[in-house]
Amino acid sequence: MNLRAGILLMLAATASLAHSAECVHVRVGYMDQHRPPYWLGDGDKVPNPPGASVDLIHDAVLGAGFGCEPTWVRLPIARLKVALAAGDIDMTPLGEQAYYPAEIALPRDKAGNIDLNRALHNTLVVLVRASDKLPARTNPMQYFKGKVLGAPQGNSFIQRLRDAGLTIDDGGRDLDRNIEKLKLGRIDGVVVGAVTPAHIKATLDKYQGTVVQLPQPMVNTRLWLAFNDSFYRAHPEQVEALWTWLDTNRGRLGYVMQKYRKPD
């Protein structure tokens, strides 16, 4: 090997090491069930397109300076929190809960409390049968006490609603199945996240006036991108940047959902 070739090889190796050092690999866990438009496809495969929530997390990882594509790990819903605490994955979406294991890191404010701003924000609304003719002033949190609300399996807000004294039937896997139960009279309403008005409108249009939305929202919810605590301590700069990115880009989920909207 001549001198010039040797120098070029050394430069290439140095550049490769520098690129590797800039890349923080993060394993992102999410549900292995088809929940359009947020998570698409069943099983451990990641389809193309993968879903609006996957797109959002992808944008957050790159926007926060991790320096490389995330690795996607699809797991049953019940395993995600356990896998995160065990370090089998580095990050997963996690909703509001009464207790968080010490092995899980969440964003904190200056007082050391969980940061309510650096999260994904959503508003829950209720879909009901048009034939019930509920008044526009109906307060969902009060009206549905003693009744049954349907919600898709695995949603992070379910426990919060149960803690508020509501009866939640989460046996239906997705929104369509819950609305069918509503039409059959097996439940009295369906809880759904109102990320964008267009998303709700598309759902209502599908049922041609038989299902309507109550005007008053039910409750505002938050969903954090939680990290394994050991991963956080190893890469605090990137993780903190990701949490701040979520706060700065609050409307991003509604934006990425546009490509999953079916044409009118």
Where are these regions (language model features)?
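Hydrophobic h-region of N-terminal signal peptides that target proteins for export
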Residues: 10-19
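Extracytoplasmic small-molecule ligand-binding "clamshell" domains
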Residues: 21-103
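Periplasmic-binding protein-like
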Residues: 31-34, 118-124, 205-243
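Bilobed "Venus flytrap"/periplasmic-binding protein-like clamshell domains
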Residues: 33, 46-62, 126-164, 178-180, ...
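Extended ligand-binding regions for polar small-molecule ligands
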Residues: 57-63, 131-134, 145-148, 222-260
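Short helix-initiation/N-cap motifs at beta->coil->alpha
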Residues: 71-82, 169-183
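Acidic, polar ligand-binding/catalytic clefts
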Residues: 71-143, 215-218
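A ligand-binding cleft/hinge motif common to bilobed small-molecule-binding domains
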Residues: 94-106, 188-219
